């Protein structure tokens, strides 16, 4: 190489350095840009025999300054940060509406206040049972509470609509990024095909990595660089989004058994493959799905459980009372049955409903019902089978009781392969209302029976106020032989029957329910009835008890018959229904030390003390229009009674649990979001320290290359002058 060539190589190297530095300066603010620099190496020296003489410089490549480790770390923390922030953005409005602990207002607890206001109205009506304004105030507070339930449920529904819209938007963005990545892969293939070996299109690689970063903020992905320089992108449980110049797409679809839920499907040719939400993690889409499945659904169901539990328990007690006109209490709240959603692929026309029959056992779970000749019911919260082999006749007749719910085949018939999803609590708060029959005269504050001791009694005996037996009471049926049994209301302690004659297969009816036992019974067999649910608790026979059917109120047609209890001695008494002139019991043993619980015609009372011979006590109907408030007091007591979650908490306690669950999750996400933001900032700083453009450094390099360029020019000028001098010499 001549001296001219050496100078030109220096000039070219400086020129490329200046061009690359200018490129860096121009893209200092370009997202995803990685600083570039030229790599210079000496040209091969010339062996002159008296030593190797250098022949200038060559630029071997223009390289990107990149740490693949930091790039991977940045993608991971960005995906996690996007997921957490997406979740947080969804939960904050919900938490604010509930009045939770992570909200900026830190809680108004509107529903809790409404519940307290409702029961304050119940107490006021109970304390003034004949006061019409107090009754009207109770109705107003009931409507206010129902409105709060409905408003909160609307908030949940709006959140669900918003989540579905954002899921669709996120899927659309993912598809767009995947298509752009596939196109860039194609451009990279073409660029590298015409380039010398080892040379890469830096700017195209930057664009691809920027797109990968944007994609990763929508959904967590992993990237593998192939031998041809293309990037393959995977997500979920290994599904391919991009391979070479081919992009695969996602699609949203309405869930087959839940029209309010969007599923994400992976499109593989003409096949749609559902991707479980738990397989989609990271990015905004992962956060949206996590919010929906982990907070929105459970929280809305928890709200519905409070609404159903309160309304059902209140209805049950209200139906045991008497209104101001002497009529039996009816339903105070209207609770429409929940209809299980049939799968869109179902062939049959079966309709399955759920109603509440035991509010204390309600859960927040949904249930799947499958039919393959018989019905199987699975609780979805823990994916456990709760009932199997249930015939269509059984489901249409007695039905099935699970977790405080009564499942019933309301109409039609299923075809093998049909399935349904029951969501008994989700959305229940929105369907609650005060019954249209409730007005100031139909509120059942009074008890339907009244007890009294005859004024002329000589002993010290007394009779309790008495109460109506509830179908929710737990009752034990104990067989003393194959043809006799005793019945005890274990909730109240009252003996309902002693030595009752039994004919095999004949119905047994107490407290407003009716059941039957199939198979041979024997002494020692014990069966339990609790709110319609039945079980065998003792005994070695194969006898089976059927589910109890609760009758329409009044629970006992003889409830308000006039009853007289007459002591034939200080230790024995007779019971006579004077309305029907029927002797209900004779020579009943009485222990003055413990007293005696008596129950007939659907009521229970207790006699205590030391009655004298011929002392009498009466039980009869409460006179309409009197200031009796016993049922009102029982209704008011429901506020502080643990009637929810297996009798472990009250209505307000169950709502407080909902607040804590949402609020605690919100607080957790606030902390996590701050942490993730800090991690992103730190990782970006570390990545930029290697890949970012520092304008001060570039200015220094520009001066360096400028000086090199000028020096190379001066060198060429000197060489040119030397050659000119030589050429000017005359031979």
Can you describe what each PLM-predicted range is?
Residues 1-731:
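S/T-rich, low-complexity, solvent-exposed segments of bacterial secretion/appendage proteins
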């Amino acid at each position: 190489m001549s001296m001219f060539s050496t100078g030109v190589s220096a000039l070219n190297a400086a020129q490329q350095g200046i061009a690359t530095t200018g490129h860096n300066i121009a893209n200092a603010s370009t997202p995803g840009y990685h600083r570039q620099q030229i790599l210079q190496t000496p040209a091969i020296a010339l062996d002159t025999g008296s030593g190797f003489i250098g022949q200038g410089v060559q630029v071997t490549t223009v390289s990107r300054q990149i740490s693949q480790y930091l790039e991977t770390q940045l993608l991971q923390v960005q995906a996690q940060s996007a997921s957490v922030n997406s979740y947080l953005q969804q939960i904050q409005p919900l938490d604010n509406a509930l009045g939770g602990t992570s909200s900026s207002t830190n809680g108004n607890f509107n529903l809790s206040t409404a519940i307290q206001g409702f029961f304050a109205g119940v107490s006021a009506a109970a304390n003034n049972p004949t006061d019409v304004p107090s009754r009207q105030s109770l109705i107003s507070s009931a409507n206010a509470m129902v409105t709060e339930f409905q408003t909160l449920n609307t908030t949940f529904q709006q959140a669900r609509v918003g989540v579905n819209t954002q899921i669709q938007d996120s899927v659309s963005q993912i598809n767009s990024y995947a298509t752009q990545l596939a196109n860039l892969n194609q451009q990279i293939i073409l660029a590298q095909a015409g380039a010398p070996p080892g040379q890469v299109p830096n700017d195209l690689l930057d664009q691809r990595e920027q797109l990968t970063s944007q994609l990763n903020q929508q959904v967590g992905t992993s990237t593998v660089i192939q031998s041809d320089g293309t990037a393959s992108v995977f997500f979920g449980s290994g599904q391919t989004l991009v391979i070479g110049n081919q992009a695969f797409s996602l699609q949203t679809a309405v869930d087959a058994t839940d029209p309010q839920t969007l599923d994400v499907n992976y499109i593989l040719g003409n096949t749609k493959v559902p991707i479980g939400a738990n397989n989609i993690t990271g990015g905004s889409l992962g956060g949206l799905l996590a919010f929906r499945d982990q907070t929105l659904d459970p929280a809305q169901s928890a709200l519905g459980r409070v609404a159903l539990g309160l309304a059902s328990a209140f209805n049950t007690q209200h139906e045991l009372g008497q209104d101001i006109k002497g009529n039996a209490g009816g339903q105070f709240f209207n609770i429409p049955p929940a209809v299980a959603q049939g799968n869109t692929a179902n062939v049959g026309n079966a309709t399955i409903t759920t109603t509440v029959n035991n509010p204390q056992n309600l859960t927040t779970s949904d249930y799947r019902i499958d039919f393959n000749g018989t019905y199987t019911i699975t609780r979805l919260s823990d994916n456990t089978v709760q009932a199997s082999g249930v015939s269509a006749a059984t489901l249409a007749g007695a039905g099935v009781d699970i977790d405080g719910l009564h499942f019933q085949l309301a109409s039609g018939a299923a075809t093998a392969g049909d399935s349904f999803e029951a969501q008994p609590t989700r959305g229940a708060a929105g369907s609650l209302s005060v019954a249209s029959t409730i007005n100031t005269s139909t509120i059942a504050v009074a008890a339907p029976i009244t007890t009294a001791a005859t004024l002329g009694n000589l002993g010290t005996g007394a009779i309790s106020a008495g109460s109506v037996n509830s179908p929710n009471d737990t009752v034990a049926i104990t067989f003393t032989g194959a043809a006799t049994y005793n019945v005890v209301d274990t909730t109240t302690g009252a003996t309902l029957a002693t030595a009752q004659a039994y004919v095999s297969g004949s119905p047994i009816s107490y407290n407003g329910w009716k059941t039957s036992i199939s198979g041979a019974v024997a002494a020692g067999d014990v069966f339990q009835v609790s709110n319609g649910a039945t079980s065998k608790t003792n005994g070695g026979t194969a006898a089976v008890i059927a589910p109890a059917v609760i009758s329409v109120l009044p629970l006992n047609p003889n409830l308000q018959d006039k009853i007289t209890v007459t002591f034939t001695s200080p230790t024995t008494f007779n019971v006579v229904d004077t309305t029907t002139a029927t002797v209900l019991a004779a020579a009943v043993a009485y222990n003055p030390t413990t007293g005696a619980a008596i129950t007939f015609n659907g009521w229970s009372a207790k006699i205590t003390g030391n009655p004298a011979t011929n002392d009498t006590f009466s039980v009869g109907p409460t006179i309409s229009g009197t200031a009796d408030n016993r049922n009102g007091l029982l209704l008011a007591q429901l506020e502080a009674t643990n009637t929810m979650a297996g009798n472990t908490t009250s209505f307000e306690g169950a709502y407080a649990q909902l607040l804590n669950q949402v609020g605690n999750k919100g607080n957790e996400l606030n902390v996590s979001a701050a942490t993730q933001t800090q991690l992103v900032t730190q990782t970006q700083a570390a990545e930029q320290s290697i890949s970012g453009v520092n304008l001060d450094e570039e200015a220094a390099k520009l001066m360096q290359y400028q000086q090199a360029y000028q020096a190379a020019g001066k060198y060429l000028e000197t060489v040119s002058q030397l050659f000119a001098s030589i050429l000017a010499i005359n031979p």
